[in-house]
Amino acid sequence: MIKIGIIGSGNWSLALSKVLISPEVTIKARNIDKAKKKFPKNKKFFIIDNFEILKDFDVLFLANPSQSLRGILNEIPKNTKSKFVICSKGIEKKTNKLMSEVLTEFFPKNNFAILSGPNFSFEVIKGLPTATVISSKNSNLSKYISKIIVQEKFRTYFNNDIIGTQIGGAMKNVIAIASGFIIGKGLGL
């Protein structure tokens, strides 16, 4: 069985846990008690606070806030062979680096993909139909990640433009807020 880990215990982690095909998912959380209350009982969740356990996982989904990614990557064992899926959207404030650039500082040889909307965690949690992009320079990795995601209401598309995908993901909320403002003011689109 494939070993899947999700680092982070926020709403995006909950959303991911609902669309992953594995009956068992390990969640790395800072607050174990809070995480246990959040995740559904229909899957077998292992909620941990130790990064060392994750070194032998097949896939690690990084679903933490973008500004905390560097600190989290620093705690993951350097000998991990895991494939990474970056779900964090944003640009690191201190360095102006994309999340993939931060990841490759720590794990330059590991395969990685970017998972990015256009979607919102609440849509996925509610089971609403939505789509996402899996972006990787390695098309086989994109296909592999797609196969571990339930496709019924969470459709995946592929591309190899990791930079464009990350910029789009970082700008998504800004555009959504601006669009909401324009609509709210009756200014049209």
Predicted regions and their residues:
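Internal alpha-helical scaffold of NAD(P)-dependent oxidoreductase catalytic cores
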Residues: 42, 68, 79, 102-111, ...
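Short, charged/polar "capping" segments at the starts of alpha-helices
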Residues: 32-38, 93-95, 141-142
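NAD(P)+-binding Rossmann beta1-loop-alpha1 motif at the extreme N-terminus of oxidoreductases
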Residues: 1-49, 55, 59
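A structural micro-motif
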Residues: 2, 23, 45, 82, ...
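Rossmann-like NAD(P)(H) cofactor-binding subdomain of soluble oxidoreductases
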Residues: 13-16, 50-54, 58-128, 145
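Glycine-rich beta-alpha junction loops
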Residues: 32, 89-91, 116-120, 138, ...
